Swiss-Prot record:
Belongs to the bacterial ribosomal protein bL33 family. This is Large ribosomal subunit protein bL33. Gene3D superfamilies: Ribosomal protein L33. It comes from the Bacteria. One of its GO terms (molecular function) is structural constituent of ribosome. GO terms for biological process: translation. GO terms for cellular component: cytoplasm; ribonucleoprotein complex; ribosome. It comes from Gloeobacter violaceus (strain ATCC 29082 / PCC 7421). It holds the Pfam family Ribosomal_L33. Keywords: Ribonucleoprotein, Ribosomal protein.
Length: 63
């Protein structure tokens, strides 16, 4: 049998939704994805589309 993998499921949250009050609709945009914790030891930051802000924003990994 294979060893338990190094891949974990993480949540990415929009950084502008927390501070921006003038947005399209209320709430915070969240995406889930996986990462290999051996190769990517730090927190991930990706630019993804936020439907609440209606634009591409930086999404940071949450704990």
């Amino acid at each position: 049998m294979a060893k338990p993998g190094a891949r974990i499921i993480i949540t990415l949250e929009c950084t502008e939704c927390r501070t921006n009050t003038a947005k399209r609709r209320p709430g915070v945009s969240r995406y889930t994805t996986t990462k290999n914790k051996r190769n990517t030891t730090g927190r991930m930051e990706l630019k993804k589309f936020c439907p609440n802000c209606n634009k591409h924003t930086v999404h940071k990994e949450t704990k």
